[in-house]
A protein has these predicted regions:
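Conserved alpha/beta-hydrolase "acid-adjacent" motif
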Residues: 12-18
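Acidic beta-to-alpha connecting loop that harbors the catalytic carboxylate
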Residues: 10-11, 36-37, 267
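Short beta-strand/loop motif that positions the catalytic acidic residue
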Residues: 6-8
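Catalytic histidine-centered segment of alpha/beta-hydrolase-like enzymes
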Residues: 37-49
Length: 438
């Protein structure tokens, strides 16, 4: 019965938490879903940010001190609707508006059904039987951005065009009026698979008049987990399965002149680790449909409370010794057919003026996979941290490598600690995890 103030962002790795808590918590609960990633809401990244400090203090004053300050008079959910915009991986401000939802679930949100057909997405079901076979290269998904963006360099999804070209795409009609969405998109599919395991990745994209493709939401379903993540269900090659792909919750307003695209693939690397075998998934279009949570005009036109401007305490006095930097690049080796995604981040170096303590850090991520070989998938994470003062220095260096074979995942880790040039501690790990469902 603990009161809950649930706060997250559509670009976070947990965009569904707020609505699930509102659905299931019996204690006093309020939710705020902004547009930011895995950062505090006052920091934005992307913005707009809000006065999260004031919001949290008011909540604690009510439930820890007993102040009758009216926080429970606020709407059940405050959510940011992103407007259609060109794709950019940078954490810049996103256009849009806040909406207030007084109760959740809300009777003002209705399901709009679009049926899959040979000509795209349509409000009327297809009258002809038509199957589409989907088989995607193992490197499909490289434009999807980071799983947990923290307002770093180019972490958000880029133009989805390259991945759309590797997917089965279903486009809806161009809109002549805005379409406002808030909630959980659901994709109902009738599928068969030619292997004993398979994966379906679904992406919703906002297609602009110039053809650029902006990722709105995505969902991934391992067909062996179609009946729940707590059980493994067999996949019988050629046998039809009725499955539901739950896409991430979203708040989005598709503007006139734009249109919706559903892109389906059998890979989403590196967001999802590839299964041991490549598989072809066949979709019965006449038995498949997409349900969208459409916001009613009553909510859309309701004034929202002022969420304020970001507030925070002043940082400790410091000087910048070295500016931060970073890079993100994709490389395809045509000889080895390896695809490499490499992300580097240098947080720079700062010195705290009152103590003279200097701090710096660097990190890197390398995602490698070879065309046609799902067992070649390899991820390397490195992170180094250094503290120094005058002629004294300590640092840690860490490395994690994730690989696999047909029966297990391999996690090999190492961390070393130094004082000056002297190694003072070293530990290594070798974990082997059976591939039960993946």
């Amino acid at each position: 019965q603990v009161p809950v103030l649930a706060v997250s962002g559509w670009n976070d790795c947990w965009p569904n938490t707020v609505l699930r808590l509102l659905d299931n918590v019996n204690a006093p609960c309020r939710g705020v879903s902004g547009v930011w990633g895995h950062v505090y809401p006052n920091l934005g990244g992307p913005g707009p940010g809000i006065d999260f400090l004031g919001l949290a203090l008011a909540w604690w004053d009510r439930w820890l001190r007993g102040d009758d300050n009216g926080v429970m008079d606020a709407p059940a959910l405050l959510a940011y609707l992103q407007d259609s915009h060109n794709p950019t991986p940078a954490p810049s401000a996103r256009p849009g508006k806040w909406v207030a939802v007084n109760t959740w679930p809300s009777p003002e949100i209705s399901a709009k059904t679009l049926h899959l057909g040979p000509n795209g997405l349509d409000e009327a079901p297809s009258v002809e039987d038509f199957d589409v076979e989907v088989f995607s290269p193992v490197w499909t998904g490289l434009t999807s951005g980071e799983y947990m963006p923290v307002a770093g360099i180019c972490e958000l999804p880029d133009d989805q065009g390259p991945d759309d070209a590797l997917s089965a795409c279903f486009d809806a009609a161009v809109l002549d009026h805005p379409l406002e969405l808030l909630g959980t998109p659901l994709l109902h599919l009738s599928v068969t698979c030619d292997r004993e395991e398979g994966l379906v990745a679904a992406r919703l994209c906002d297609i602009s008049p110039d053809g650029s493709s902006t990722l709105m939401s995505y969902g991934i379903l391992n067909l062996r987990l179609r009946d729940g993540r707590d059980r493994v269900s067999e996949v019988h090659p050629g046998k039809a399965m009725e499955v539901t792909v739950r896409l991430n919750d979203l708040g989005w307003r598709i503007l006139p002149g734009h249109h919706l695209r559903l892109a389906l693939s059998t890979q989403m690397w590196p967001m999802a680790w590839p299964l041991a075998q490549e598989a072809t998934v066949s979709i019965d279009l006449a038995a498949s449909r997409l349900e969208l949570p459409v916001l009613g005009p009553k909510i859309s036109g309701t004034p929202t409370p002022d969420l304020g401007t970001p507030q925070a305490a002043d940082p400790l006095p410091h000087r910048v010794v070295r500016q931060g930097s970073g890079s993100r690049k994709q490389v395809h080796d045509p000889l080895s057919q390896e695809h490499l995604l490499e992300v580097k981040a240098d947080a720079g170096e700062i010195e705290f003026e009152t103590t003279g303590l200097r701090y710096s850090s660097t990190s890197s991520q390398r995602y490698r996979i070879v065309e046609g070989d799902p067992l070649s998938a390899c991820v390397e994470y490195r992170a180094d941290f250094t503290f120094a003062r005058e002629d004294w220095q300590v640092r840690t260096e860490s490395l994690l490598v994730v690989t696999c074979d047909a029966t297990q995942f391999r996690l090999d880790g190492r961390i070393t600690a130094y004082e000056g040039t002297d190694l003072v501690c070293e530990r290594t790990w070798e974990e082997r995890i059976p591939r039960v469902a993946y």
